């Protein structure tokens, strides 16, 4: 089946603007235009339902229901439980909060692995855990290809490693990492995985359950939605980590 590009473009009000007609935008890294369905829903929310949700009056009930619909729908797309989907201001901020939770859960001597193929969002917050007594190890790219080799990961894994953070797709060399293979190796060593899907999600909707990732992060404002970060975290792992909210 051929993709009807004209139909696709018609779903985005931005492209009805004269100054944008006939143009293609490759700026997902910074954000994408929202489709009409998203804009309409946000307009309805701000006009009719911007109240405390789950209350006893109509606007509050309806607003809460729409929030639940968004979570349930997204969970279905991603192949996970509703309770495993969280919303935040951005992937960078979600990762920061997540790192603070791990900082309280990890003990001195525990190790985490980060890569030098990652965007800063999935490496900076984790690297700073070294100030809390956590051993931070770097899974380095092959200098010739820019890719991450699984053999190098194996050399870093041991019983002390509790978390491995890496990108689904590099935003520098565009290499798609073999997430399922990496997850299998890390789980066999007793660790968890945190996958940054920001550069992958706009091009291939991930089935997180199939990938096996314990944590999967991406940004809805880079996938034609509102300015939010999406975090999937497996229920059993979420229950282990100290709560960072109120």
Model-found features: residue ranges?
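Pyridoxal 5′-phosphate
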Residues: 1-246
